Amino acid sequence: MLKEERFQQILQYLQKDNKVVLSDLSRVLKVSEDTVRRDIKELSAQKLLKEVRGGALPHAPGPVDFKERENYAIRKKQVIAKKAVGLMKKGQVIILDSGTSALAVANAIPKDLNITVVTNSFPVVELLDERKDIEVFFAGGKLHRESLITTGHDTIGFFENIRADLFFLGVCSIDIELGVTGHYYDECAVKRAMIKSSREVFALSTPEKLNTAEAFSICQLVALSGIITSSPESSVMKTYKEAGINIV
């Protein structure tokens, strides 16, 4: 079997099963595990999958750039946002992450809740600019153009001095073993600081982001108070519920 044919089959199995295992691929493709490992490394270099110990996981579907993501899965994000604001209480300090799901949460905050929102997201600040009932703190730093946020040491230092009641974490990928992962190193570093500064952390995730992985680690699932999703009864959520993860 030619290498290109193996590549095609590996990607087909990945699409079908949402993961591939070296030993299984070795048996099916009738090649050594070392050969399969090299194939996966090459596919990972082409950004067609994420290499993990013993196999590979898919990347999360959908666009990466913020402006492209704004019109992606809008209805699902609205469902998530409604659940998120239901967890807010009057007078709380809330950290809102970057991402279009967090923007949907900001848009859904009810009137006269009188909360404080802390964020590094330019779109969130712009949206809340006219909300006189919400006190807004913005973390300065280096502009990250793809995500329309600030990053860097100044941003991290800012969040280290915050004590928030709730943090709504926008995610690229979630996996039961790898936890929450993201595309950009600098952005993930800021998210880790946000987690450390928050009493409760809720990940905002549509079902298709589960069982996927990206390059940079944010946190293990034990750091989460729960996962807020648009389809809590989806079959993909079963493994997470069985692991004791709170699914909202």
Question: Where is each model-derived feature located?
Answer:
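Conserved phosphate- and dinucleotide-binding cores of soluble alpha/beta proteins
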Residues: 2-5, 11-12, 19-25, 125-248
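Hydrophobic alpha-helical segments
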Residues: 74, 78-81, 99, 103, ...
